[in-house]
């Protein structure tokens, strides 16, 4: 018996097997849900939903948007930062 299998309870699966068998939950696209078709750089309330607490743009897999929408969000966030509507980084603690 392998050392890791010896410590395992009977009938228990390894974490890797359990993760492989689990079906990933489908992300709901927040822009489609709200009916937003155009992402404006002046809409800072919307853009803040796609920025982390550290000021980074969140990934597609986290937000659930399409690749085209992700590019539009990135462009809008960068424009808003340039126009001083959004900070480049988060405030220091």
From Swiss-Prot:
Domain of life, per lineage = Bacteria
| InterPro entries the record matches | Ribosomal_bS18, Ribosomal_bS18_CS, Ribosomal_bS18_sf
GO annotation terms (biological process): translation
Region Disordered: start and end of each range? 1-27
> GO CC terms on record?
cytosolic small ribosomal subunit
Keyword terms of this UniProt record? Ribonucleoprotein, Ribosomal protein, RNA-binding, rRNA-binding
Q: Which Pfam families does its entry note? A: Ribosomal_S18
Which Gene Ontology molecular function entries are recorded, alphabetically? Answer: small ribosomal subunit rRNA binding; structural constituent of ribosome
**Matches recorded under Gene3D superfamilies:** Ribosomal protein S18
Q: Where are the transmembrane segments?
A: none
Q: Where are the compositionally biased (Basic residues) regions?
A: 1-11
Q: Which family does the record claim for this protein?
A: Belongs to the bacterial ribosomal protein bS18 family.
Describe the subunit structure. Answer: Part of the 30S ribosomal subunit. Forms a tight heterodimer with protein bS6.
NCBIfam families in alphabetical order: S18
User: What is known about what this protein does?
Assistant: Binds as a heterodimer with protein bS6 to the central domain of the 16S rRNA, where it helps stabilize the platform of the 30S subunit.
What is this protein's record name? Small ribosomal subunit protein bS18
Which species is listed as the source? Salinispora tropica (strain ATCC BAA-916 / DSM 44818 / JCM 13857 / NBRC 105044 / CNB-440)
């Amino acid at each position: 018996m392998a050392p890791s299998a010896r410590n395992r309870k009977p009938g228990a699966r390894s974490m890797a097997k359990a993760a492989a068998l689990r079906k990933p939950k489908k992300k709901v696209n927040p822009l489609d849900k709200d009916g937003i078709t155009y992402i404006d750089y002046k809409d800072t309330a919307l853009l803040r939903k796609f920025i982390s607490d550290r000021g980074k743009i969140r990934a597609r897999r986290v937000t659930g948007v399409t690749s085209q929408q992700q590019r539009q969000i990135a462009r809008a966030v960068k424009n808003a930062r340039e126009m001083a509507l959004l900070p480049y980084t988060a405030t220091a603690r």
